[in-house]
């Protein structure tokens, strides 16, 4: 798709919409998700915003340089934000737009990423994970299927043939497999793709900068 110019990520859920947290609440999972002492200063960014940001970095290979965030709490009976809209600048000059929300009624775990470049764009949707849409600036739209012929890289992370869903747990299996291979490998030049503590540090820095930006209502570097 050429030089990357714009990245758009949205990840929406609805579990916190209209929720009321009290001592009699039987849904204990909601308690820790909205407990600042446990989850941190942001409900939406700590839970799903990290996934959105890491996904954009992984797919594009780019790192953010500055951002402007607008954090919002839509539910009256909770103490943490559940909606975040973030404008991003990347190191190569590309722009980004993020929307993550856990109070979007009807939001069915809708994780979607679109990356636009000088020669076209790609789009991937979590609810239809086996397919990647390639939109060339010139020519017809192409739908690339998981494990398609010639996709050596994706085949390394696939355990079933094309047309069959991998399943959620296989994502963890890919991480374990790469870590084990890295430990046992004698090839020091081989590049591995599993996330490390460094990626965790980057996302933690991203979250804190979003919180500071929203509070100060200004662009911040990170």
Residue ranges of predicted features:
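Glycine-rich, aromatic-lined ligand/substrate-binding cores of catalytic
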Residues: 46-67, 72-121, 127-130
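Alpha-helical packing segments of well-folded alpha/beta enzyme cores
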Residues: 52, 175, 179, 203-207
């Amino acid at each position: 798709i050429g030089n990357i110019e714009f990245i758009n990520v949205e990840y929406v859920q609805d579990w916190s919409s209209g929720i009321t947290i009290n001592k009699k609440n039987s849904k204990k999972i909601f308690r820790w998700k909205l407990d600042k002492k446990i989850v941190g200063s942001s409900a939406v960014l700590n839970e799903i915003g990290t996934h959105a940001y890491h996904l954009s970095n992984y797919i594009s290979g780019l790192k953010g340089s500055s951002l402007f965030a607008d954090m919002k709490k839509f539910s009256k009976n909770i103490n943490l934000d559940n909606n975040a809209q973030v404008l991003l600048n990347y190191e190569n000059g590309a722009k980004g737009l993020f929307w993550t929300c856990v109070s979007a009624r009807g939001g069915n775990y809708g994780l979607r990423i679109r990356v636009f470049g000088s020669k076209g764009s790609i789009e991937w949707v979590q609810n239809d994970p086996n397919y990647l849409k390639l939109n060339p600036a010139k020519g017809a739209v192409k739908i690339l299927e998981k494990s398609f012929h010639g996709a050596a890289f994706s085949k390394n992370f696939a355990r079933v043939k094309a047309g069959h869903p991998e399943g959620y747990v296989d994502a963890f299996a890919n991480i374990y497999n790469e870590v084990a291979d890295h430990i046992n490998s004698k090839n020091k030049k081989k590049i591995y793709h599993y996330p490390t503590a460094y990626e965790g540090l980057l996302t933690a820095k991203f979250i804190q900068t979003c919180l500071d930006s929203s509070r100060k209502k200004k662009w911040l570097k990170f």
